[in-house]
């Protein structure tokens, strides 16, 4: 079982913690992680693109000129696709781009990125993370004490408003609950700060 240092929020070590090998100690599967990121990014697309077809463009109800005798090509409407200002053929319409990968694949992806953080020594497990009031200065001091200088994902066991508000104005820092941890967030942040209680919740779901 992988073993990592356990820290308190002052930045000093408080011993070690053993992580579940089936969650934090697997061989990362890069192709599955790639598929999971594609799925998440697809679901973020708005899909509100829209153009008008010939039935939706204003006008064009009258035949522009008679069928025969003018010498010109026959036309039925000034809103046909070949006309300037006419309707678009097979243009984009509003749609949802979201899709779901199988549950086992999604779980393998999140296990892979969590294991990668352990392998790269980019995971910091905290005994607890509590703040009496929401103060950005206090959160910045905690991150500095833990030598976190780049983008960091903070994972708490439950909703913690003080922590979320304190980290909100720090660039590159995101706070999520254990049940909301996802592949895209873990990959987009160099450091993973996770409380001991959150580790237990994640292991309970994924092990």
Curated annotation (Swiss-Prot):
Key word Flavoprotein present: no
Keywords annotated in UniProt: Ribonucleoprotein, Ribosomal protein, RNA-binding, rRNA-binding
CC per GO annotation: ribonucleoprotein complex; ribosome
Coiled-coil boundaries: none
Recorded superkingdom: Bacteria
GO process annotations (BP): translation
Region named Disordered: 48-85
InterPro entries assigned to the protein according to its UniProt record, in alphabetical order: Ribosomal_uL4, Ribosomal_uL4-like, Ribosomal_uL4_dom_sf
Family stated for the protein in its record: Belongs to the universal ribosomal protein uL4 family.
Protein's name in the database: Large ribosomal subunit protein uL4
Species whose genome carries this gene: Bacillus subtilis (strain 168)
